Amino acid sequence: MYEDGLSFLEEERDAFRPFEALLELTDEQLEQPLDGAHGWTGRDLMAHLGVWIERWLEVAKELAVNPQSPAFDELMALEKDWAAKGDELNAQYQAEWASLPMAEVRRRFSTWPGELRGYLTVVPETRWLKESGHLKSLLGNTTEHYADHEPELRAILAASGR
């Protein structure tokens, strides 16, 4: 799919860029629930994407120094049970992020994607780009996941007049 890691990193960067518009919204705009976004707020969308970026950031940190990643194994266990527990987990993650100060939500959302890209530059490509299970999970938690949530992003931005 990708000839080199840089190709993925550029695609991921481009795919995430539209979501950075959430950082330009006021705290009040980020807290406004919307029907067109499954009742989510901008904060909820930031949390939802952030959780999975964070999980892959942990995987990348481990893969940078070892060929195996316990964090990846945990992620695979979550994905295996997703059909049964996905809504429950999403609600849990949403509640965890709702308890954070908005400044922390913004910090995580603005820094973790870049940190993930940075770590992936030092992970040997054989451990993520050329390893089909890792690549499939990475895509599912980044570029494909972003695409899945573009409708919510559009609704949130439209409600804020953007």
What are these regions (language model features)?
Residues M1-D4, A37, Q94-P101, K130-H134:
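Short amphipathic alpha-helical segments at helix-loop
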Residues M1-L30, V51, R55, A147:
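Alpha-helical bundle segments that constitute or directly flank the non-heme di-iron/ferroxidase center
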Residues G5, P18-A21, K85, W112, ...:
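Terminal low-complexity, poorly structured segments
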Residues G5-E12, G42, M102-F109, L135, ...:
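Hydrophobic packing residues in well-ordered alpha-helices of helical domains and bundles
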Residues E12, L78-T126:
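Acidic/histidine-rich alpha-helical segments that form the ligand environment
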Residues E31-A84, G118-R162:
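Short, contiguous alpha-helical
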